């Protein structure tokens, strides 16, 4: 994630009441100070927070949530210091979503971000709370995120960057660079295909040249039958299959039925594809073999080298 993330859709509403109930059994301090609680109750709450965060972040390998939960009380010095550790993140959850209490974060000395929503931010940032008057109004806990390896990040639009990964986890589109072993029936050398989690394929590049016909095929075998052979009426001569029952992009346990295929339409989306295409040209040393067999006598074998780039795209 970036250094700051604001949760403004009530993501933590399900545990807000649990935190309020936990506060009722906390021994109240008579001085203006914070109270840190660690118990079996906070472990359960931490587990709930972890599950919520897993739904919010993509390409995360592991999320650790501290079972130490700090209830923040009014401090007359208006300054909060919980730890000297500046690695990881703080998560702030408001006990009551009143707009009067605010978190102020300072990315730079000249910049302030103010929020009255639940918020998560890097421990390296300076911060303070405003209008925390009388009683406990919010809780804080420490969060650690470990990300899956990312090949690179590519700008998708003016405000968003996407991680390009070699991992299937938490992704829903695979950009496949497919190089074909020489064969007298094949007219192409390299094609690039988008494969969604239902296995449907969209041809987007030939010889690294953008292809805009937007024809969606139910499988890679169907795409090959329609597009890569020199012979006319190939469908009347043979059909293709993968004897291992594999999909070209996804493990079988990752396949999902009913997915809509992402089709690039806007200039920004085609610019994104062009950037991905350029990266693929110079980062294709890792590949898998994929084999299709034609039911001729004797059988005809077509071998492909496939380099895979996984992306998570929000689309309908």
UniProtKB/Swiss-Prot annotation:
<keyword id="KW-1035">Host cytoplasm</keyword>
<keyword id="KW-0244">Early protein</keyword>
<keyword id="KW-1048">Host nucleus</keyword>
<comment type="function">
    <text>Plays a role in the inhibition of host NF-kappa-B activation. Mechanistically, blocks the subunit p65/RELA translocation into the host nucleus.</text>
</comment>
<dbReference type="InterPro" id="IPR005004">
    <property type="entry name" value="Poxvirus_C4/C10"/>
</dbReference>
<comment type="similarity">
    <text>Belongs to the poxviridae OPG031 protein family.</text>
</comment>
<protein>
    <recommendedName>
        <fullName>Protein C4</fullName>
    </recommendedName>
</protein>
<dbReference type="GO" id="GO:0042025">
    <property type="term" value="C:host cell nucleus"/>
</dbReference>
<dbReference type="Pfam" id="PF03336">
    <property type="entry name" value="Pox_C4_C10"/>
</dbReference>
<dbReference type="GO" id="GO:0030430">
    <property type="term" value="C:host cell cytoplasm"/>
</dbReference>
